[in-house]
A protein has these predicted regions:
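N-terminal active-site beta-alpha-beta segment that forms phosphate/nucleotide-binding
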Residues: 1, 145-226
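Conserved phosphate- and dinucleotide-binding cores of soluble alpha/beta proteins
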Residues: 1-148, 216-386
Length: 386
């Protein structure tokens, strides 16, 4: 919207979450009084209006730039929103500063490789030692090399893998999914390990399509991607309902099915693309451990045992703030599944329902006693698949 000179964005994304002005409107605390985001209706539908924020300066990075400022990104693992930022700042009369690894003669970069045209760039900084990642470069992330199936290390058999395996059962052949950061990021690796990675397509908000998502500090990259999209285009696809399933992680879950990932225990973690991804997906799979803080489990022989319980409740009566709205999900007809290492829950009109129990887990001692609210126990409570 900034590049196009539009006043803002009208979207269903964020309804009934912390960015909705009927809640906190995205305000961090009571110091901020003005409502930046507006709630409105159009043709009988609810929307939030996000005003355009004019940008004065941006710092972007490329790999190669020619002497006219035309830049390519062949060594970058994603294109993210580099072009969109440059356009927005330029059209606002601002300053676009581009860093690149090398400079070449004007016109020597193939036009199909150019991601940022020179007329958008005001200042070029050459850094011959710039690194692609924290620890250098990885040609598997850029797609220059293809990793063999057995070259990708499998996850150890622990609580994270238990969650990833169960979550994987929520995606079907031909589906398009998103994988978020956190405990959910192991799903792509498990899919490759199980030999089903080619049956569906996993995407990451930063742009990769297909392949196996990287984990930890390298999240946002993928190995063996089939395509690499600009991040704004990826989010257009998400916001428009293109995802069949979203795999995301949760920090807090409350009795109404709301999830908080952005602000808890006095810490501001931020949302990333969480709100967008949740808002448009047909199915939302939220992954996490039942408790946090020193939780230790033992996995083996088809069972899981709690060796040391976590110090902190994650299933609480009411979320401090709402990043994902259970109410809105039910309004939109989304299927919502919450997967932990010891149980699976689903969101219904009646509330959060316990539907599956892991082998080796006691429902009273290991589930209900460890939650801040009592879930509805399904009359068809079944065992989690081993």
């Amino acid at each position: 919207t900034a590049a196009a000179g539009q006043p803002g964005l009208l979207s269903h994304v964020g309804l009934n979450t912390f960015v909705d002005p009927r809640q906190k409107g995205g305000k961090l605390n009571d110091v901020t009084k003005e409502d930046l985001i507006k709630y409105t209706t159009l043709n009988g539908k609810e929307y939030l209006f996000y005003p355009t924020v004019p940008l004065d300066v941006c710092f972007i990075r490329a790999t190669t730039v020619d002497s006219d400022g035309y830049a390519s990104m062949e060594d970058e693992i994603t294109y993210v929103d580099v072009l969109a930022m440059a356009q927005a700042v330029h059209n606002n009369g601002g300053l676009v500063i581009l860093q690149a690894k090398r400079m070449v003669k004007a016109g020597t970069i193939h036009p199909r490789q150019v991601k940022v045209p020179g007329y958008l760039v005001d200042i070029v900084v050459i850094n011959e030692k710039q690194e692609q990642l924290y620890n250098g470069s990885d040609a598997f992330f850029t797609g220059d090399y293809i990793a063999e199936e057995d070259d990708n290390a499998s996850l150890p058999l622990d609580q994270r893998k238990v969650v990833a395996r169960r979550a994987l059962m929520e995606i079907g052949p031909g589906n398009v999914g998103n994988v978020g950061v956190g405990i959910a990021d192991g799903i792509g690796t498990v899919a490759r390990e199980e030999g089903v990675g080619e049956e569906f397509t996993l995407t990451v908000e930063t742009g990769p399509v297909g392949g196996a998502t990287a984990q930890g500090i390298f999240f946002g990259a993928s190995i063996n991607s089939k395509a690499l999209m600009d991040m704004p285009a990826q989010f257009d696809f998400y916001d428009g309902g293109g995802l069949d399933v979203a795999f995301l992680s949760f920090a807090e879950l409350d009795a109404k099915g709301n999830v908080n990932v952005h602000k808890f225990n006095g810490k501001i973690m931020g949302t990333g693309g969480f709100v967008n991804i949740c808002s448009g997906s047909k199915k939302v799979v939220l992954c996490g451990t039942l408790r946090a803080g020193g939780l230790k489990t033992e996995v083996g022989n088809g069972q899981i045992k709690v060796a040391q319980e976590g110090r902190f409740e994650k299933m609480i009566p009411e979320c401090e703030e709402i990043t994902f709205s259970g109410e809105q999900a039910l309004k939109q007809g989304q299927k919502v599944v919450y997967i932990t290492e010891r149980a699976v829950f689903e969101l219904t009109e009646e509330g959060v329902v316990l539907t599956e129990l892991a082998p080796g887990i006691d429902v009273e001692k290991d589930i209900i006693a460890q939650m801040g609210f009592k879930p509805i126990i399904s009359k068809e409570l079944k065992q989690m698949d081993e």
